[in-house]
């Protein structure tokens, strides 16, 4: 029973690493947190994350921590309460591997210029990284962290597979 949770800002290999893990481990990928979901209200948000916490042998591309970051950044988004967050963390602590993927702001901005994004712009990256640092340092679960400016997606995927096997 494993829940692999990939967190981090845009352009930090979350989807790429998720695809590589899925191929190797045969785990499905679930999109955990999204801008659309964040507009649905607190109860629906909690219900969604609570249901995801019951899953086993899946890869979640963004989960509760991304919600906390983006709901603080974009004020009209729903956010989990501290109590709801701790409830979910308690539920998954025995099976979750929380992976925080990040990079230097200049690396992310360069990748963002190449890829583009309908929600996030280069000017948002510094504040998003700061919020991630705050949120991830307050996470109630052990977190594994990789700088995607220094590690390739292949290296990160191999390391995560080593952690879960």
Swiss-Prot record:
- InterPro entries attached to this UniProt entry: P-loop_NTPase (IPR027417)
- Record's Gene3D superfamilies? P-loop containing nucleotide triphosphate hydrolases
> Out of the domains of life, which is the source?
Bacteria
Q: Which GO terms describe its biological process?
A: dTDP biosynthetic process; dTTP biosynthetic process; dUDP biosynthetic process
Instruction: List, in alphabetical order, the Gene Ontology terms for molecular function in this entry.
Output: dTMP kinase activity
Q: Which GO terms describe its cellular component?
A: cytoplasm; cytosol
Q: What is this protein called?
A: SPbeta prophage-derived uncharacterized protein YorR
Q: Which gene encodes it?
A: yorR
């Amino acid at each position: 029973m494993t829940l692999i949770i990939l967190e981090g800002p845009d352009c930090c290999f979350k989807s790429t690493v998720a695809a590589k893990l899925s191929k190797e481990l045969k785990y499905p990928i679930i999109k955990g947190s999204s801008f659309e979901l964040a507009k649905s209200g607190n109860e629906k948000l909690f219900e969604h994350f609570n249901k995801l916490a019951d899953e086993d042998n899946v890869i979640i591309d963004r989960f509760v921590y991304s919600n906390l970051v983006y709901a603080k950044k974009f004020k009209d988004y729903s956010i989990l309460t501290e109590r709801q967050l701790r409830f979910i963390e308690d539920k998954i602590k025995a099976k979750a591997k929380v992976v925080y993927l990040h990079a230097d702001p200049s690396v992310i901005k360069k990748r963002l210029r190449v890829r583009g994004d309908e929600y996030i712009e280069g000017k948002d990256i510094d504040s998003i990284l700061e919020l991630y640092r705050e949120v991830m340092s307050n996470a109630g679960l052990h977190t594994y962290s990789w700088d995607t400016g220094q590690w390739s997606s292949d290296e990160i995927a191999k390391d995560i597979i080593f952690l879960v096997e």
